[in-house]
């Protein structure tokens, strides 16, 4: 990451800029609350009530994996991919090195004379690729069939094996150096192994040793990151696990990735130093110009070179004044990747759906220049394209999330009001709606297709969602979150996650019959349906949810009431209408009781009752407002058509 205090030129003329005191993020990008109320009751990032499940003629709860995969991989000439660089071909995790003829050591620096797969066998079968040495790669190849894992680990280990072997005397050292020279990213990475910075073309034994040690340390740190994630999220879905695995591959290869940009190489025009940052340009060069490197690494590079994914890692781990000083710059470093795995990676299918929608939204506006736009965008909106206005909206929403995160530092009310007004205008703009409703599904499909392993995981999860297996897993996770302060499990996150994943299916598989959330619920065993209904009674008919929310430190009664209503709406999206109607009076009575029993609640009641003394519900309650999808970056939402 590069640190810059210079805001986007466009923003200064569009809305008053927040001060550094307002810009402080305590939560990752997709977790920031981007609504004025700041309330949200679900575990997933999608706010219920803004994504509707339209009825379909779904005839069963499962689609075959092969048919879904076929729908996902089907090429579509009508899809626009102008905002995503499509030069990078799909890379198989088991891609072998180039099959060109064996090169002599003196010609090995020419990529056209790259070592073949059989040439690399001297590394794969050496003492430097022993079972003990390969253990560090096990978490990164665990997704592969058992018979493929050892070879994939050997390919990932090649840079380390080559560096150690090149320090020997004799023919093996020459072969190892030929391999290093044939792979430009590896050559530059070894060149700067000891002292970093400038590649001078002089590779010493100290450089070789330092590089090998750096790679081993990076891989070991990646293992720790994955282990921590697995410990914290034992019920993570296949898609989220695949994202974490891919991120771990990148984390383990950071010494290579940071050196992959062609501008870092000896003799490059406009030569730059290796500075610990990774860019999309560097990742694309790693894929295209390094025939001896692992196919698994290239597949990971292909994924993280996508603008939407790269942007999410760019700011991972930044908080407080570091966040305030940082402008998104489309580069990341090792600490960003570790922080993303440990703290920002999705933990369930609903969070994955939100993350993918956010990434697709960013992809949709990547490369759209708004640096010369100003307030005319709002005063004369017809003069600008939907793409331009969408790019401005996303930029404002990114600013908005930082401002909201800085509420504890100062009063941000005026700044938020200005942002909210501008964002609302763009959200309601038909051109913006039309552009994003077309481009986001296209970009979601493009992002999933960028990695064949992710594609497989998405198809597997779709089957889990439609069968109800994913819902049951998320319900079990919610049960484990119960403690003395929160004695009643909250299943609203599991239900909103279900809705988010079904919406994602509609985007990814436009020709498939996708069930509604209520259809999935109705196909669950009686004990699952009863479990959710009983939870509704405890949380809403008996007031448990509101009681827990009001009991939290620094809780606001109005926001607590809104959050409880959001949670209630999630349950009601799947429960039978006659059951919900039968609980309505109990809900009203318990809500009034909990508010009256709380000092915060009593204060709220003074301003929230009408002349007859009846409680007046928040006007933005999902139970009362339209369920149309809104464009809201950070929650995976957009306007439906």
Swiss-Prot record:
Residues 1-20 have a biased composition (Polar residues). Signal peptide: none annotated. Residues 1-127, 598-628 are annotated as: Disordered. Transmembrane segments: none annotated. InterPro entries: HrpK. It comes from the Bacteria. Pfam families: T3SS_HrpK1. Residues 603-614 have a biased composition (Basic and acidic residues). Residues 44-121 have a biased composition (Low complexity). This is Pathogenicity locus protein HrpK. It comes from Pseudomonas syringae pv. syringae. The gene is hrpK.
């Amino acid at each position: 990451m590069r640190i810059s205090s210079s805001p986007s030129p466009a923003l200064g003329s569009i809305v008053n800029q927040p001060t550094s005191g307002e810009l402080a993020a305590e939560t990752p990008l997709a977790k920031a609350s981007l609504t004025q109320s700041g309330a949200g009751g679900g575990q997933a990032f999608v706010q219920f009530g803004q994504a509707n499940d339209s009825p379909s003629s779904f005839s069963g709860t499962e689609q075959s994996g092969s048919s879904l995969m076929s729908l996902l991989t089907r090429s579509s000439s009508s899809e626009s991919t102008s905002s995503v660089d499509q030069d990078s071909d799909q890379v198989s995790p088991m891609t072998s090195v180039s099959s060109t003829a064996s090169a002599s050591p003196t010609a090995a620096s020419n990529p056209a004379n790259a070592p073949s797969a059989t040439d690399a066998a001297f590394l794969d079968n050496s003492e430097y690729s022993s079972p003990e040495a390969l253990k560090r790669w096990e978490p990164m190849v665990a997704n592969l069939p058992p018979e493929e894992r050892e070879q994939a680990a050997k390919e990932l280990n090649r840079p380390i094996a080559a560096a150690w072997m090149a320090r020997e005397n004799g023919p093996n050292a020459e072969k190892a150096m030929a391999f290093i020279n044939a792979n430009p990213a590896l050559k530059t990475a070894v060149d700067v192994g000891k002292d970093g910075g400038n590649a001078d073309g002089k590779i010493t034994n100290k450089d070789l040793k330092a590089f090998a040690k750096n790679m081993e340390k990076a891989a070991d740190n990646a293992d720790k990151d994955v282990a921590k994630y697995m410990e914290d999220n034992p019920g993570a879905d296949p898609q989220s696990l695949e994202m974490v695995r891919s991120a771990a591959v990148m984390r383990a290869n950071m010494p290579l990735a940071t050196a992959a940009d062609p501008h870092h190489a000896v003799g490059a025009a406009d030569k730059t130093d290796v500075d610990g940052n990774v860019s999309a340009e560097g990742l694309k060069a790693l894929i295209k110009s390094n025939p001896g490197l692992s196919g698994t690494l290239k597949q990971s590079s292909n994924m993280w070179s996508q603008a939407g994914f790269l942007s999410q890692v760019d700011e991972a781990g930044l908080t407080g004044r570091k966040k305030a000083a940082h402008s998104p710059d489309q580069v990341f470093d090792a600490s960003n990747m570790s922080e993303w795995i440990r703290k920002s990676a999705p933990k369930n299918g609903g969070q994955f759906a939100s993350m993918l929608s956010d990434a697709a939204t960013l992809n949709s506006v990547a490369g759209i220049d708004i640096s010369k736009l100003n307030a005319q965008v709002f005063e004369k909106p017809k003069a600008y394209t939907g793409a331009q206005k969408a790019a401005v909206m996303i930029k404002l929403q990114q600013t908005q999330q930082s401002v909201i995160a800085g509420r504890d530092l100062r009063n941000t009310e005026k700044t938020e009001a200005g942002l909210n007004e501008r964002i609302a205008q763009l959200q309601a703009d038909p051109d913006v709606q039309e552009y994003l409703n077309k481009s986001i599904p296209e970009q979601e499909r493009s992002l999933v297709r960028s990695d064949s392993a992710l594609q497989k995981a998405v198809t597997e999860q779709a089957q889990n969602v439609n069968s109800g297996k994913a819902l049951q897993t998320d319900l079990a996770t919610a049960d484990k979150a119960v403690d003395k302060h929160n004695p009643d499990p909250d299943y609203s996150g599991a239900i909103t996650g279900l809705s988010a994943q079904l919406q994602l299916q509609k985007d990814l598989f436009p020709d498939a019959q996708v069930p509604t959330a209520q259809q999935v619920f109705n196909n669950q065993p009686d004990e699952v349906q009863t479990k959710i209904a009983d939870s509704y009674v405890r949380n809403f008919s008996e007031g448990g949810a509101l009681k827990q929310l009001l009991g939290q430190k620094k809780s606001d009664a109005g926001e607590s009431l809104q959050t409880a209503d959001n949670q209630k709406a999630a349950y009601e999206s799947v429960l039978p209408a006659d059951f919900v109607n039968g609980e309505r009076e109990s809900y009203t009575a318990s809500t009034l009781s909990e508010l009256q029993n709380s000092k915060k609640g009593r204060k709220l009641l003074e301003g929230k009752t009408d002349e007859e003394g009846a409680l007046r519900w928040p006007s933005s309650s999902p139970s009362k407002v339209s369920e149309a999808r809104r464009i809201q970056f950070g929650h995976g939402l957009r306007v439906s058509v």
